[in-house]
Curated annotation (Swiss-Prot):
Assembly and oligomerization: Heteromultimer composed of HisG and HisZ subunits.
MF GO annotations: ATP binding; ATP phosphoribosyltransferase activity
PANTHER family: ATP PHOSPHORIBOSYLTRANSFERASE, ATP PHOSPHORIBOSYLTRANSFERASE ATP-PRTASE
Upper lineage: Bacteria, Bacillati, Bacillota, Bacilli, Bacillales
One Pfam family hit: HisG
Biological processes annotated in GO: L-histidine biosynthetic process
Domain of life of the source: Bacteria
Recorded GO CC terms: cytoplasm
Organism encoding this protein: Staphylococcus aureus (strain MRSA252)
Xref: InterPro entries: ATP_PRibTrfase_cat (IPR013820), ATP_PRibTrfase_HisG (IPR001348), ATP_PRibTrfase_HisG_short (IPR024893)
Cross-referenced HAMAP family: HisG_Short (MF_01018)
Protein name: ATP phosphoribosyltransferase
Location (main, coarse): cytoplasm
Length: 204
């Protein structure tokens, strides 16, 4: 049995679409037909569905053998896992966004403090970072901050709130990670699963 931690939300939707495209229907249908279950089984695979930021923790602690998670999570802090593969879905990017007329930044709201701090330091810009856990756009709309650092996929949410993308910071994609011990103990199962996803270690 191979246990896989999968990030709920947008990334899981992208995974399901990818599984459909490669006709890995047993897994895609299981994920589609979930109701409120957080633990699902199909064939020799057990899926645990968790918040994205918790995926590497479940893998690191050995509860899950494999994790599928956005690189944004892995960039925020170090986890003792094998960061194994780029996955061909879940593409988006980090960006600085603000009101169209904004040209200077003193305060920035973000859920991704490390990414924001690294970016502004690289530009020689001294900003105050305010950590929020959701709806960071609102902080800019009500003028609590001058701008935000957030994940952008289509830009629809920014546009709906009167914000525009100012700077592209870095690309984000889905990553496949493994528990370090499981990578050796369950190497055949892990390699079989990777083959079933039609990706290669060359994508690392």
């Amino acid at each position: 049995m191979l246990r896989i931690a999968i990030a709920k939300g947008r990334l899981m939707d992208s995974l399901i679409n990818y599984l459909d495209a490669i006709e890995f229907t047993t897994l895609s249908e299981t994920l589609k037909n979930r109701e409120r279950q957080l633990l699902l089984s199909v064939d020799n695979i057990e899926c645990i569905l968790v918040k994205g930021s918790d995926v590497p923790i479940y893998v690191e602690q050995g509860i899950a053998d494999i994790g599928i998670v956005g690189s944004d999570i892995l960039d925020e802090r170090h986890y003792n896992v094998n960061n194994l593969l780029n996955m061909p879905f879940g593409a988006c990017h980090f960006a600085v966004a603000a009101k169209p007329e904004t040209t200077n930044y003193r305060k920035i709201a973000t859920s991704y403090v490390h990414t924001a701090e690294t970016y502004f330091k690289s530009k020689g810009i001294d900003v105050e970072l305010i950590k929020l856990n959701g709806s960071v756009e609102l902080a800019c709309v009500v003028d609590m901050v001058d701008g935000i650092v957030d994940i952008v996929q289509t830009g629809t949410t920014l546009k709906a709130n009167g914000l525009v993308e100012k700077q592209h910071i870095s690309d984000i994609n889905a990553r496949l990670i493994t528990n370090k011990a499981a990578y050796f103990k369950k190497s055949q199962l892990i390699e079989q699963f990777i083959r079933s996803l039609e990706v290669s270690i060359a994508n690392a």
